[in-house]
Design a protein with these regions (language model features):
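Short intrinsically disordered, low-complexity coil segments enriched in acidic
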Residues: 1, 21, 108-109
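N-terminal secretory signal peptides that target proteins for export/translocation
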Residues: 1-8
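Bacterial N-terminal signal peptides
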Residues: 10-23
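N-terminal secretory-pathway/extracellular module detecting exported/lumenal segments
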Residues: 25-128
Length: 128
């Protein structure tokens, strides 16, 4: 192969590599977290990331959630925890999982008995 052919192939390779590189930024941008407040009490605020909601082929979804504990005296945030919540929309059940988990890792489903934050999280998440 002559020098001209080599330069042409190198240019084509660089061009396509650049296109692949740029397309990865588009994916990162679309995966941006968008926290939406879904419930609040005097002791805490529950958020969901609307962009993280994923349904499986049944009526079960996963959503990234964030809970911020609030000091009731001065309304400052004391601590924040993020986790993945699996939600059975049909039966209004939930399961908390580590952030990088998958829906098939759900072992037990819980009812949101007397938990306003979880109930509202289920209702809001299932409305998407």
């Amino acid at each position: 192969m002559n020098l001209r052919g080599f330069i042409k192939q190198a240019f084509i390779f660089c061009f396509f590599s650049f296109l692949i590189f740029l397309s990865s930024f588009n994916r990162l941008e679309s995966a941006e977290i968008e926290w939406i407040e879904v419930a609040k009490t005097t002791n805490g605020i529950q958020f969901i990331d609307r962009n993280s909601i994923k349904y499986n082929n049944r009526s079960i979804l996963s959503v990234l959630t964030k809970y911020s504990e609030i000091n009731p005296d001065d309304q400052t945030i004391v601590s924040t925890n993020s986790y993945l919540m699996a939600i059975d929309c049909e039966n209004r059940l939930f399961s908390k999982l580590p952030v990088n988990s998958k829906l098939d890792q759900v072992k037990n489903w819980d009812e949101p008995i007397n938990d306003k934050l979880i109930k509202k999280t289920i209702i809001n998440s299932c409305s998407y």
